[in-house]
């Protein structure tokens, strides 16, 4: 079939297998052109391995440190008439490239929140990997089924305490407009913490620990975005921020739980980027379009792979990593420093429907959005008849 992007709201409902493979290859190439990670990981579990920061983590571990990677994701496979999700094609491309490079890998497609997938992962590790020395937790999901109660919880993106009116950008209609978000109820907050907080990260690491498959001095990290003033009402001081705070609690719990292994558990704060997750959050498309403009002018713009390679070399595999007062690793400093934020805030005050395309880097935003789904690459023929059925 000939595959062109079908965009609905903040999501693209199809993806291109050749373009997704190109996206993966470019990230692999970036890592290959960098120095190998000194004393890097050898056996890595990436929970949420198929897109965004999780995919970049898997690529960095495999191609930067020759690690054996086990990836867990939840992706739809293709049919004769329908493309797979981008994460499916990304994983297929990763398999192909890792295979060519002689690297060991395995992927499990299923609900990472479930006990069954945790057990399947443990079985694979026992049979094929021995002990894991790095666990990356990079899940973004709107829903989670509690494995104990069977109840399904849904996360919401709402401010806490009071109604919040702000500017946002509708990518579908190419429109800057005001949006008013009603405050979260206590139930909204609790549900969002249940889905996006640290509980499942804890369950994973505890299950691995109880099964005896974590190595001594093992590290684990979960990803967060903390942001600054402009994003605080919808991020930091909002339901999602409350869930991310719960990651800090989980990190402390895990260190205590696994003290026999001298486990290190970090929450890693990364920069705002176009991902399938961030596209869904009000305010973020406009904010990201502005930070892309400012950071590209400053020469500090980074994508997922640049961020994660630095996280590995400057954070996780640095004998003396810099931590904040809560013990977190930060790779977001190029975005969150006062000078850069002041420039972004000035643009935010000025931006309207009329001047948006002059003040913001919408082209950069839109191109990266398309790249997530395998579209918009200049060296891919989008008029070619492609078989959507790619297996892995």
Curated annotation (Swiss-Prot):
Its EC number is 1.3.1.9. It catalyses: a 2,3-saturated acyl-[ACP] + NAD(+) = a (2E)-enoyl-[ACP] + NADH + H(+). InterPro entries: Eno_Rdtase_FAD-bd_dom (IPR024906), Enoyl-CoA_Rdtase_cat_dom (IPR024910), FabV-like_NADH_b (IPR050048), Trans-2-enoyl-CoA_reductase (IPR010758). The gene is fabV. It comes from Idiomarina loihiensis (strain ATCC BAA-735 / DSM 15497 / L2-TR). It is an enzyme of class 1 (oxidoreductase). Keywords: Fatty acid biosynthesis, Fatty acid metabolism, Lipid biosynthesis, Lipid metabolism, NAD, Oxidoreductase. Belongs to the TER reductase family. Involved in the final reduction of the elongation cycle of fatty acid synthesis (FAS II). Catalyzes the reduction of a carbon-carbon double bond in an enoyl moiety that is covalently linked to an acyl carrier protein (ACP). GO terms for molecular function: enoyl-[acyl-carrier-protein] reductase (NADH) activity; NAD binding; trans-2-enoyl-CoA reductase (NADH) activity. The record marks 75 as: Plays an important role in discriminating NADH against NADPH. The active site is at 235 (proton donor). Pathway: Lipid metabolism; fatty acid biosynthesis. Monomer. Substrate binds at residue 225. This is Enoyl-[acyl-carrier-protein] reductase [NADH].
């Amino acid at each position: 079939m000939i595959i062109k992007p079908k965009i609905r709201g903040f999501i693209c409902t199809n993806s291109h297998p050749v373009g997704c493979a190109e996206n993966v290859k470019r990230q692999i190439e970036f890592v290959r052109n960098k120095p190998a990670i000194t004393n890097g990981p050898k056996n890595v579990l990436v929970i949420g391995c198929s897109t965004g920061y999780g995919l970049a983590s898997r690529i960095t571990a495999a191609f930067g440190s020759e690690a054996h990677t086990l990836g867990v994701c939840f992706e739809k496979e293709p049919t004769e008439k329908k493309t797979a999700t981008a994460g499916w094609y990304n994983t297929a491309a990763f398999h192909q490239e890792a295979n060519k490079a002689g690297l060991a890998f395995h992927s499990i497609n299923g609900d990472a929140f479930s006990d069954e997938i945790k057990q399947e992962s443990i079985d694979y590790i026992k049979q094929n990997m021995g002990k894991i020395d790095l666990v990356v937790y990079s899940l973004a999901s709107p829903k989670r089924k509690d494995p104990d109660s069977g109840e399904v919880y849904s996360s919401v993106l709402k401010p806490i305490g009071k109604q919040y009116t702000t500017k946002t950008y509708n990518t579908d209609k190419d429109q800057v407009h005001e949006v008013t978000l009603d405050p979260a109820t206590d139930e909204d907050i609790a549900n969002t913490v249940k889905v996006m907080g640290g509980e499942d990260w804890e369950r994973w690491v505890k299950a691995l620990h109880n099964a005896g498959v974590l190595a001594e001095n093992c590290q684990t990290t979960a990803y967060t975005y903390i942001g600054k003033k402009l994003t605080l009402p919808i991020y930091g001081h909002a339901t999602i921020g409350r869930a991310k705070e719960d990651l800090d609690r989980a990190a402390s719990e895990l260190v205590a739980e696994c003290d026999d292994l001298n486990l290190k558990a970090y929450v890693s704060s990364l920069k705002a980027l176009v991902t399938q997750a961030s596209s869904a959050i009000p305010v973020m498309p406009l904010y990201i379009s502005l930070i892309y403009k400012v950071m590209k002018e400053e020469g500090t713009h980074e994508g997922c792979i640049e961020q994660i390679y630095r996280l590995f070399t400057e954070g996780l595999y640095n004998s003396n990593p810099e931590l904040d007062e809560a013990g977190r690793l930060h790779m977001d400093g190029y975005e969150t420093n006062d000078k850069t934020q002041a420039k972004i805030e000035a643009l935010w005050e000025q931006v309207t429907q009329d001047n948006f395309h002059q003040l913001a880097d919408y082209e950069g935003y839109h191109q990266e959005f398309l790249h997530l789904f395998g579209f918009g690459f200049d060296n891919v023929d989008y008029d070619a008849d492609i078989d959507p059925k790619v297996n892995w």
